[in-house]
Amino acid sequence: MRDAKIIVVDDNEAILRSLRTVLSHEFKTIVTVSSPVLLPALLRNGDVDLVLLDMNFGTGKQGGGEGLFWLDRILELKNPPAVILITAFGDIELAVSSLKKGATDFIVKPWDNENLIQALTHVLER
C-alpha cells in the first residue's frame, strides 16, 4: 500500500463509493467529498498528495467549467497537490485545456481500474 493521501471530489455518491473501494486497496488515505466547496478546508494543512476532481457538479452541467475553476483555486495554493481531472463528458479540447492549466492528467468515465491506479501511481511518483 502506498503512503499517500488522496481526496476524491465528485457529486455522484455511487462514483465516490466506487473510487473509495478501488483506491483504498492501493493508497493509505482516501477522503471522499461530494462538493468542491469543501476543498479549501481539506487542503489547508498541506498534507494532501493528490486530488481526483470531477469536472461537472450538478444536474445538466457538462462543460467542465466548474472543474477548471477549482483546478485554478487548488493551483493557487502555496504547495498545491497534484490534480487529476475526471469526467464523463470529456473531449480532446477540454483535456488539452485542463493540462495547459496545470492538471497532471485527465481521465474519462467510465474508467478502467488498472489504468486509473497506474495514472495515480505515476503522478505520485513524480
Model regions: which residues?
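Two-component/phosphorelay signaling modules centered on CheY-like receiver
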Residues: 13-31
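Active-site beta3 strand of CheY-like receiver
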Residues: 46-52, 56-57
